[in-house]
Amino acid sequence: MTNLKEVTFEKPSYDQWQEAAVKQLKGKPFESLLTKTIEGITLEPLYTEERLLEALDGKLEEQVSTVRALKADGDFGVAQQAFGSSIEEFVAQTNDAFARGAQYVTVGKVSFEWDEAALKQLAALIDTHKQVVLYVDNKEVVNVFNFVTDKTVTGFIVSAEPVELTDFANVRTLNAHTQTVHYEGANATQELAIALAQAAELLGEDFAANEDKFFASFAIDPQFFMEIAKIRAFRVLWKAFAQAYGVTSPKPVQIVTETSLRSFSKLDVYVNLLRAGNEAFSAVIGGADVVTVHPHNVLTGPTNQSVRIARNAALVIKEESHVTKVLDPAGGSYFVESLTHDLVKNAWAYFLEIQATGGYTAAQAKIAADVKVVWDKRLADVETRKAVLVGTNNFADATEEVPAESFVDVNRLAQPFEKLRVDFKENPVKVAVLAYGELKKIKPRTDFVTGIFATAGVTADVTEPFTDVEAAKNYLATTDAQVVVFSAVDEDVEAVLPQIIASKQPGTLLDVAGKFDIDGIDGALYAGMNIYEKLEGIQTSLKEVQR
């Protein structure tokens, strides 16, 4: 009898694995397993130690050690924003947050004015709790330091504009602020390069003199592994950046993060919980020093409950995941290390392009143009469902209305579909799906059609499946629906649809489910199409008919 402890298995090579994978693809090319990210990085289906070492030219250990050397420890600070309709409510929320695990007095957008009385109460909070993060939405809030008496408080002033602050040596004010370009559409490569370009201007000629005042801030997207790699890559880039100043051993660089609102939606807002939790976890694993989790309903106005849930998302990661017990928990992952390397290489190249243009300020036109290309690609991916916003461009609830309230206004990918809902509510459209054939065969196409209209807040009426051409003609001739979509299997589309087109009433739009080109129809709904343009086009066409 064979002793299982003595059984050995031959380790297959990458080529052997690839050969086996191709056989399973049943005629599809191996390249179908590759995925290109919006950064232009090609994701492989398998990462191995050998291929990683080859890609890094044997410098894997150097990359890992750099990431770890430039992170002070494995912990992170919970910076949960307080809101409130008054300074008194803001103070109460902040004190409650500290009692429940928050570590920074965190200020962002509020719905009251920062007058002298409010600033004095905020200053008292900072004196009490000793740590502060100011997300500068209103420049007046920076004046709080005129009233802070404890000059040893620590913290960060997160601002797109440089802030001068004397007497507070432990408050960092030189911020490589990438949130602005993030909301303009920038990808991870661009954010990293722009952070370096900003750092070059902020630090000037004397790296050592300004190092203790510098930090970088990033908004973290839902692309889990890419965002982990983004934070790690910045530390590798920071070492190279410091070496350009002749500093071989820079101090750990501080990184402040906030969950991104770029993928947030006013629709199906509880999905924002998942987005924010995912983003927060990737920030922590990537090595963020400070994490702010935005409430799921921050777009329309946060509540005490949503603020508590957001804070608890960070606290659960901090207290229950144990990732803070490890320095650089993602280190050594072939996939993450490969992504980190690709981002470092590409971001440094783009940084040099910016510097060749004259630096960050001089390169504003170039940066804006480059970032717009990426934003347009992001929008196109959402509008064609290549990228899915659950509850917004797919799996949407047709009965949900877009809240009119607006508390935070940033560039978001969901906005076109939110606008569609408003348009279709103001100009209602009756849509019917003319089902033809056996139900179980046509249901996938029918559901696809109803799902598309649901993204605009339209509940499409689906007929009982017809099996008789004359009955289908009669329905088309008598329906009060303004838009009718014919849904059937391919054979029935080609055989039946041409026979019933003539029965269409004037002013009725007749479309087909599936990518067909048939004379007499107004259009088609199919996978991969730009559903936003299609739905917007329906509105435009019906308005023209009404005129």
Task: Provide a role label for each language-model segment.
Residues 1-223, 302, 439, 443, ...:
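Catalytic alpha/beta active-site cores
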Residues 7, 28-29, 34-35, 44-46, ...:
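Intrinsic disorder at enzyme termini
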Residues 42, 79, 106, 133, ...:
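Structured core elements
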Residues 213, 250-252, 288-290, 348-351, ...:
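Active-site lining segments that contact anionic ligands and/or coordinate catalytic metals
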Residues 217-249, 254-403, 527-533:
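Active-site capping/gating regions of soluble enzymes
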Residues 298, 333-338, 433-439, 472:
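A short beta-alpha structural unit
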Residues 314, 337-340, 344, 351, ...:
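Generic hydrophobic alpha-helical scaffold/packing signal
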